Swiss-Prot record:
Interacts with the regulatory subunit KefG. Residues 356-475 form the RCK N-terminal domain. Its main location: membrane. InterPro entries: Cation/H_exchanger_TM, K/H_exchanger, K_H_efflux_KefB, K_uptake_TrkA, Na+/solute_symporter_sf, NAD(P)-bd_dom_sf, RCK_N. Belongs to the monovalent cation:proton antiporter 2 (CPA2) transporter (TC 2.A.37) family. KefB subfamily. Pore-forming subunit of a potassium efflux system that confers protection against electrophiles. Catalyzes K(+)/H(+) antiport. The chain crosses the membrane at residues 2-22, 24-44, 56-76, 84-104, 121-141, 146-166, 176-196, 199-219, 237-257, 260-280. It is found in: Cell inner membrane. This is Putative glutathione-regulated potassium-efflux system protein KefB. Keywords: Antiport, Cell inner membrane, Cell membrane, Ion transport, Membrane, Potassium, Potassium transport, Transmembrane, Transmembrane helix, Transport. GO terms for biological process: proton transmembrane transport. GO terms for cellular component: plasma membrane. It is a multi-pass membrane protein.
Length: 557
């Protein structure tokens, strides 16, 4: 992040001067925050969001109100009127959503208690944008002229309509798109959803990031969650980087030079007040002592919402001259993160208990369903990936957590939890997909135990050559079992038939391994015939030897 900021300063008006129209770039680059909030929304379904209500409306509200009150009081000690001080206090109480979320991700705070609390505070700050903007014309004494209650009521109705429409329309629309099987169309639809929800909220005069966050939450429990995240992630990273570069370009180093002492004092006071409030709230909430300062430091910088609020206040003539220079608050970012972010804790509490699957099952057809049901019955945490949308819809009707997506995409595996999982079970129908997945897992997720489905001996050879020893030939075991039952019907003792089955399995596996070097050789067919004769001879010899021995089961008949 610091690199992006320095790059922005270097190419901006106060650096080499390559870019002069910073405002246009800054407005466009805000889409990075919009995409980031959509992905954050995908990670929180409504039930989990409801579980955070205490921290959102408790700690979040307390942080905004206490910080705003203290900062407004300090501003009133200077030459600010009380109305301007209130607006200034609210603006400075906010934190930078983009910077704070990025810092929390870099430091691994997302799955800790402090990260959960930090996200709750940021979410409440986004919600507080609406009443804060509505407060400005009231403080300016122009409510009658500029505060149209009818218009506000219509915006509320439109907002509710968006929630209801999104709740009942998004999944059917994406189901129709996924049925086409064209990945590019799915990506285009995802971009349309994110940009459309952002522009709709912007038209209502609300936060674009809040709109995309809500869209993400509405789709968090859908079968398309991981595929949506994979489709949007490259755009999020690119635009978020542009956002930080544009912030660096917009820094007014001239104000810093002419008002250096005032800037330093302002930054120190702002940081000190917010750290004090955040630290006390973290202590009251019960956050571990080792995480309190980290939590307070990450959220103690100024936020981009101050630009919007202060420009609105200036248009209402609450501010005069150059009383405010909110852009300067961006300078505290990386210094604070280095000062207050200690080493990551090994005993961090998980944010979402089921967010780290033990097993990823790829493919949920007839073969994969048996494996999945067995794992679920034994309380294993699994994530199932399936690219047949009809199968996904059917399985979700019966309560299975199956997600739509092509598992041969590395980003999809990563978002599905491959980095935290212990094993992956590959049950693809196509051998090419199976081998491609094996290669991807060995290259990008070498810690995973790979278990695979082999349709026949050819696939079994390929898996063994690739180093996969845990596999199952789909017809082999069932055919052996039926063969054992056939031997019993022909008069063989059940125990003897069981022994015959085990012998055959062991000898066949040995022959399978011996044939690996000649798997692609032209003499494979003749060698297979020879091996089959050897197998019959060995099998017959061992079975005759067993018949000579006194069988323990026969003794008690």
């Amino acid at each position: 992040m610091l690199g992006y900021l320095l790059a922005g300063i270097a190419i901006g008006p106060w650096g080499l001067g390559f870019i002069s129209d910073v405002d246009e770039i800054l407005h466009f680059s805000e889409l990075g925050v919009v995409f980031l909030m959509f992905i954050i929304g995908l990670e929180l379904n409504p039930s989990k969001l409801w579980q955070l209500r205490r921290s959102i409306f408790g700690v979040g509200a307390a942080q905004v109100l206490l910080s705003a009150a203290l900062l407004a009081g300090l501003l009133m000690l200077t030459d600010f009127a009380w109305q301007a001080a209130v607006v200034g206090g609210i603006g400075f109480a906010m934190s930078s959503t983009a910077m704070a979320l990025q810092l929390m991700r870099e430091k691994g705070m997302n799955r800790s208690e402090s990260g959960q609390l930090g996200f709750s505070v940021l979410l409440f700050q986004d919600l507080a944008v609406i009443p804060a903007l509505a407060l400005v014309p009231l403080l300016a004494g122009s409510a009658d002229e500029h505060f149209d209650w009818m218009k506000i009521g219509m915006k509320v109705l439109e907002f509710v309509g968006m929630l209801i429409g999104g709740r009942y329309l998004l999944r059917p629309v994406f189901r129709f798109i996924a049925a086409s099987g064209v990945r590019e169309v799915f990506t285009a639809a995802t971009l349309l959803l994110v940009l459309g929800s952002a522009l709709f909220m912007d038209a209502l005069g609300l936060s674009m990031a809040l709109g995309t966050f809500i869209a993400g939450v509405l789709l968090a429990e859908s079968e398309y969650r991981h595929e949506l995240e994979t489709a949007i992630d490259p755009f999020k990273g690119l635009l978020l980087g542009l956002f930080f570069i544009s912030v660096g370009m917009s820094l007014n180093l001239g104000v810093l030079y002419t008002h250096l002492l005032w800037v330093v004092i302002s930054v120190v006071v702002l940081v000190a007040v917010k750290i004090l409030v955040l630290y006390l709230l973290a202590r009251l909430y019960g956050v571990r002592s080792s995480e309190r300062m980290q939590f307070a430091g990450v959220l103690s910088q100024g936020g981009e919402f101050a630009f919007v609020l202060f420009s609105t206040a200036s248009s209402q003539r609450l501010f005069q001259g150059d009383q405010m220079a909110p852009l300067l608050m961006k300078l505290v970012d990386k210094w604070l993160s280095r000062q207050f972010n200690g080493p990551e804790e090994e005993d961090e509490k998980p944010w979402v208990n089921d967010d780290k699957p033990q097993v990823i099952v790829v493919g949920f057809g007839r073969f994969g369903q048996v494996i999945g049901r067995l794992l679920m019955a034994n309380k294993m945490r699994i994530t199932v990936l399936e690219r047949d949308i009809s199968a996904v819809n059917l399985m979700r009707k019966y309560g299975y957590k199956v997600y739509y997506g092509d598992a041969t995409q590395v980003d999809l595996l990563r978002s599905a939890g491959a980095e935290a999982a212990e094993s992956i079970v590959i049950t693809c129908n196509e051998p090419e997909d199976t081998m491609k997945l094996v290669e991807i897992c060995q290259q990008h997720f070498p810690h995973l135990h790979i278990l695979a489905r082999a349709r026949g001996r050819v696939e079994a050879h390929e898996l063994l050559q690739a180093g996969v020893t845990q596999f199952s030939r789909e017809t082999f075991s069932s055919a052996l079992e039926l063969g054992r039952k056939t031997l019993v019907t022909l008069g063989m003792h059940p125990h003897q038939a069981q022994r015959a089955q085990l012998h055959f399995r062991r000898l066949d596996m040995r022959m399978l391994r011996e044939l690996i070097p000649m798997h692609a050789d032209t003499v494979q067919i003749s060698r297979a015939r020879e091996a089959r004769r050897e197998l019959e001879e060995i099998f017959q010899r061992e079975m005759q030897q067993e018949r000579r021995q006194l069988d323990g089961w026969d003794e008690f008949e």
